[in-house]
Amino acid sequence: MIQQQTMLDVADNSGAKKVQCIKVLGGSRRRYASIGDVIVVSVKEAIPQAKVKKGEVARAVIVRTSREVKRPDGSYIRFDGNSAVLINKDLEPIGTRIFGPVARELRARKFMKIISLAPEVL
């Protein structure tokens, strides 16, 4: 569960290292986001010569959460940390590589480009 002010790691090579959630998209009263949800983030840490700079506002899709997510078959999945992949307005990833595993829930949300770039889908 991601909410405003949550710090997330970035799981791609866009150049950002840490981002902070500043808005959960999908309704004016929506408070929490989970795997596959799109959020608005502010870049808090970035490497030099990055595609995104520190202080920039971007969109991101959540690919891993510490909070467990229940699946239709009754199983749960959770990860060691909260991670996101930066995306543009067309919901395409900004980076060209994805680091670490991503959740299968992204496939149902039509993030096929992220699924294909990921080294492992859990």
From Swiss-Prot:
GO biological process: translation
GO CC terms in record: cytosolic large ribosomal subunit
One Gene Ontology term of the molecular function aspect: large ribosomal subunit rRNA binding
PROSITE patterns: RIBOSOMAL_L14
Pfam families, per database record: Ribosomal_L14
Record bears the keyword Amino-acid biosynthesis: no
Keywords: Ribonucleoprotein, Ribosomal protein, RNA-binding, rRNA-binding
Protein's name according to its UniProt entry: Large ribosomal subunit protein uL14
Gene that this sequence comes from: rplN
